[in-house]
């Protein structure tokens, strides 16, 4: 028996110079007979052995594909190791075929690289894609693995590469023909293309041998069309634009603070404006406080000078006589019809406590009832409270927020106020409310502080059943306008 002929041994040590296209190192069979069976049954974790298998099963594996172009976007945080991996690849493949285009680094996203294969052959595509797809997982799945040309068992090849959309195949659709031969194909055409004029292919391979076998069959059917000169720049621009849109949709809230505005420059521009506004507000508040204090002191001085002492009988008689004279003088100016139709209010008020008064029909009048006021007297008293409130508000700042209270006759006039309540609120921008009996007590302090003797001779408060109290809240100048409108209702 003749001795078995040993095969030629090729050591895949790194050559001194760069190898030409298609001349990758081959491996020895270590004296074992080479099996030329089904290529899908062959499995090895060594990239060189898998390349040797592709070379033996594909006759055109070393022939370059005319007009071929493949782009593989890669994102990595370890730029140093990536540069070392690219240097190792360039030892076996020319830089005219394998090119790398770095993208500007973005915060917390790592460095983006565009790996471009141009005018390549089947061995080039299998070699580059296997090494780079394994590199993405090797950094954290197998950090102890030092060789870039061995794919450990626990690493799956996953990723996406892009081809021009004008590719053609000799046997119908690429993925359709693949699924006839291998239902669970590791290379799948993506239905939705994120980059215009480019077709995306997704890789999901559990073993490097299966991936290389399917990739070699894939490119053996592909025919590339003609591409524009600036196709790489076009791809980079469109890919980056699409990625930015996706990032903006996913990370919309963080970009408001970090990506859309330059916070430092924004603060430097707005800080002086805010400080100026703050200083003006502080100055305005101090001026308002000083003005209110001065107005309050003046308001306290005037009523004390005009208010007579309650325990002095002489002052009471003098004030009552002055009141009667002033009332008589004021009522002389009223129209003649008031004097004819009803008796004088001066006589009624002066003779109120003098005893019962009889008319011609013999009936007694109600002048003997203490505290009784006619409707006209009640109206004059309410007008006096409105005018006194206007003077009290005018003594304060026109920008101060106040709450005032005035009286209104229940008969006839309060219904008119109710009908015009919404109109009064809209014209004055004040909160105008007619108080009920349960919250009537809140107006007592304000009404007692008013000095109505300067505006009416009927200074005593009418019976609560004959009047209603109106509350007006808002800014000082608007309250004055609201009081003028209510006064206009009572006078006309």
Curated annotation (Swiss-Prot):
One of its GO terms (cellular component) is U2-type prespliceosome. Residues 1-35, 300-371 are annotated as: Disordered. It is found in: Nucleus. One of its GO terms (molecular function) is mRNA binding. Residues 1-15 have a biased composition (Basic residues). Keywords: mRNA processing, mRNA splicing, Nucleus, Ribonucleoprotein, RNA-binding, Spliceosome. It comes from the Eukaryota. Residues 18-30, 329-353 have a biased composition (Polar residues). InterPro entries: Snu56_snRNP. Component of the U1 snRNP particle, which recognizes and binds the 5'-splice site of pre-mRNA. Together with other non-snRNP factors, U1 snRNP forms the spliceosomal commitment complex, that targets pre-mRNA to the splicing pathway. Present with 361 molecules/cell in log phase SD medium. This is 56 kDa U1 small nuclear ribonucleoprotein component. It comes from Saccharomyces cerevisiae (strain ATCC 204508 / S288c).
């Amino acid at each position: 028996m003749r001795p078995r002929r040993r095969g030629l041994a090729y050591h895949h040590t790194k050559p001194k110079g760069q190898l030409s296209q298609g001349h990758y190192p081959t491996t020895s069979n270590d004296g074992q007979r080479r099996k030329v069976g089904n290529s899908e049954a062959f499995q090895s974790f060594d990239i060189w052995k898998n390349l040797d298998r592709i070379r033996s099963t594909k006759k055109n594996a070393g022939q370059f594909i005319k007009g071929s172009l493949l782009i593989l976007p890669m994102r990595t945080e370890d730029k140093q190791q990536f540069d070392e991996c690219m240097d190792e690849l360039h030892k076996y493949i020319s830089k005219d075929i394998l090119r790398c285009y770095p993208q500007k680094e973005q915060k917390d996203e790592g460095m983006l690289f565009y790996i471009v294969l141009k005018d390549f052959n089947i061995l080039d595509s299998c070699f580059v894609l296997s090494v780079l797809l394994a590199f993405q997982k090797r950094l954290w799945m197998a950090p102890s693995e030092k060789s870039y040309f061995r794919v450990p068992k626990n690493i799956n090849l996953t990723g996406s590469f892009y081809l021009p959309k004008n590719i053609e195949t000799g046997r119908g659709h690429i993925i359709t023909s693949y699924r006839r031969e291998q239902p669970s194909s590791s290379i799948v055409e993506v239905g939705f293309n994120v980059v215009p004029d480019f077709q995306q292919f997704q890789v999901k391979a559990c073993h490097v041998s299966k991936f290389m076998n399917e990739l070699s069959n894939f490119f053996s059917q592909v025919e590339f069309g003609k591409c524009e000169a600036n196709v790489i720049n076009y791809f980079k621009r469109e890919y980056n634009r699409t990625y930015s849109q996706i990032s903006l949709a996913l990370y919309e809230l963080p970009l408001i603070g970090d990506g859309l505005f330059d916070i430092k420059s924004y603060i430097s521009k707005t800080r002086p404006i805010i400080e100026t506004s703050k200083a003006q507000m502080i100055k305005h508040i101090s001026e308002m406080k000083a003005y209110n204090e001065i107005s309050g002191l003046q308001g306290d001085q005037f009523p004390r000078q005009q208010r007579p002492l309650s325990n002095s009988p002489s002052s009471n008689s003098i004030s009552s006589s002055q009141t009667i004279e002033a009332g008589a003088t004021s009522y002389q100016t009223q129209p003649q019809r008031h004097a004819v139709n009803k008796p004088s209010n001066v006589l009624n008020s002066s003779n109120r406590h003098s005893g019962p008064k009889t008319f011609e029909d013999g009936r007694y009048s109600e002048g003997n009832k203490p505290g009784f006021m006619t409707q006209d007297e009640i109206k004059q008293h309410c007008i006096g409270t409105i005018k006194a409130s206007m003077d009290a508000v005018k003594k304060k700042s026109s920008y101060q927020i106040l709450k005032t209270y005035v009286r209104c006759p229940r008969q006839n006039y309060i219904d008119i106020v109710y009908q015009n309540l919404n109109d009064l609120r809209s014209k004055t921008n004040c909160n105008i409310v007619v108080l009920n009996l349960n919250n009537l007590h809140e107006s007592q302090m304000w009404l007692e502080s008013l000095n109505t003797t300067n505006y009416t001779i009927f200074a005593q408060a009418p019976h609560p059943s004959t009047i209603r109290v109106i509350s007006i809240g808002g800014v000082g100048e608007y309250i004055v306008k609201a009081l003028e409108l209510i006064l206009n209702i009572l006078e006309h």
